[in-house]
C-alpha cells in the first residue's frame, strides 16, 4: 500500500512516500528525521499524528530529511 524510499544527491537527502491505495494509509518513518514542509505534495496538506504520516488515497510526497 505504501512505497517509501530515500534519495541523496551530495549533502541533500529526501524521503519519497507514495500511497498506491484508494484508501487512507498510516505510515511511520521510523529512524528518519523529517524536514518541516514537503517539497512536493500531491494533496492539499500533509497530516501528521504523532510520529505517523496520514496519507490520502494515491497521495505522493517528497520531504527533505534533516
Regions found by a protein language model. Name each.
Residues 1-66:
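Carbohydrate-interacting/catalytic domains
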Amino acid at each position: 500500500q505504501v512505497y517509501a524510499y530515500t534519495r541523496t544527491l551530495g549533502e541533500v537527502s529526501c524521503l519519497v512516500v507514495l500511497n498506491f491505495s484508494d484508501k487512507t494509509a498510516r505510515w511511520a518513518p521510523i529512524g528518519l528525521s523529517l524536514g518541516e514542509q514537503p517539497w512536493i505534495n500531491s494533496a492539499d496538506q500533509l497530516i501528521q499524528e504523532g510520529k505517523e504520516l496520514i496519507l490520502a488515497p494515491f497521495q505522493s510526497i517528497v520531504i527533505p530529511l534533516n
